[in-house]
Amino acid sequence: MLAASPTTLPLFLALSACKGPAVLSGPPPVAPQTQMLLHAVTAELNLIWIYNKTMAEYSGLDSALAPLLAEHQAHLARLRARVIEPPGKKTPSAATARPAIAGTSAAALAQLRDAEQAAVTAQLGRLAGASPSLAQLYASIATSEATHVTALDGRIARS
């Protein structure tokens, strides 16, 4: 038991005013880097969705689009592997953007190309706030998506 003395009383009063962790106040906010990673997961889900819908609408494009879709599925797996699910926050599992597929196969390819270009820009925008290993992953995915833009441009030119 502490005895009240000139040195222990101020210490006791100071310590009793300290707050501990707010255990019951809910989960802590999600860190910005984790938010970026979750946005990257959602972006890949959106690209996968538009590829699947385009291939369902224009089956003649399957052979050209299937390899690009497979790369996006690999990107998604690599991104998800980096997610440590934060308390109170679920890892995205469904597309959030579901645009209508263009009315012709050439227009659908152009729509995919534009989506890929937007994805490149978004991935590059994530670099500044990312850890070195995440920045490397984002840059790798952006590079892959840039090659998709070129491949889709070539396919559009042949249409």
Model region roles, listed by residue range:
Residues 2-159:
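All-alpha RGS (Regulator of G-protein Signaling) helical domain and cognate RGS-like helical scaffolds
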